[in-house]
A protein has these predicted regions:
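Arg/Lys-rich amphipathic alpha helix in sigma70-family domain 2
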Residues: 65-68, 79-94
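Structural recognition of an alpha-helix C-terminal capping motif at a helix-to-coil junction
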Residues: 37, 51-58, 62, 71-83
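Hydrophobic side chains within well-formed alpha-helices
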Residues: 9-12, 23-24, 52, 73
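Amphipathic, Lys/Arg- and hydrophobic-enriched alpha-helical face
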Residues: 28-46, 63
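A short, charge-rich alpha-helical start-of-domain segment used by transcription regulators
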Residues: 13-36
Length: 94
């Protein structure tokens, strides 16, 4: 997804912190490919990867206020995705 001129990642994240659904959708579309790539590495198949990706984004939006703006967003997102995939795997093994 290409951002509109003048709309920076930081601005999208800021609006996500205020609860803007439009900006949550923008963030989802912007990082969907990146998130799926990570999820596919930690999942058994594409359907599981899609569930991990969607669950991870739900966690991101619920906890976006805990994101530290001084660190790269992608690194934080990656951590959330990996932890979500591991949690799902543990749940499936039970």
């Amino acid at each position: 997804m290409h951002l509109r001129p003048g709309v920076a990642e930081e601005e999208i994240i800021h609006h996500c912190k205020t609860g803007s659904l439009k900006h949550q959708e923008m963030l989802y579309k912007l990082f969907y490919g990146y998130a799926m790539g990570i999820s596919l590495r930690y999942s058994l198949n594409r359907d599981d990867a899609l569930e991990v990706t969607n669950d991870a984004f739900i966690k991101v939006f619920k906890s976006i206020n805990s994101y530290n703006n001084t660190k790269p967003f992608k690194a934080w997102l990656r951590t959330v995705i990996i932890n979500t995939a591991i949690d799902r795997r543990r749940k499936d093994l039970k």
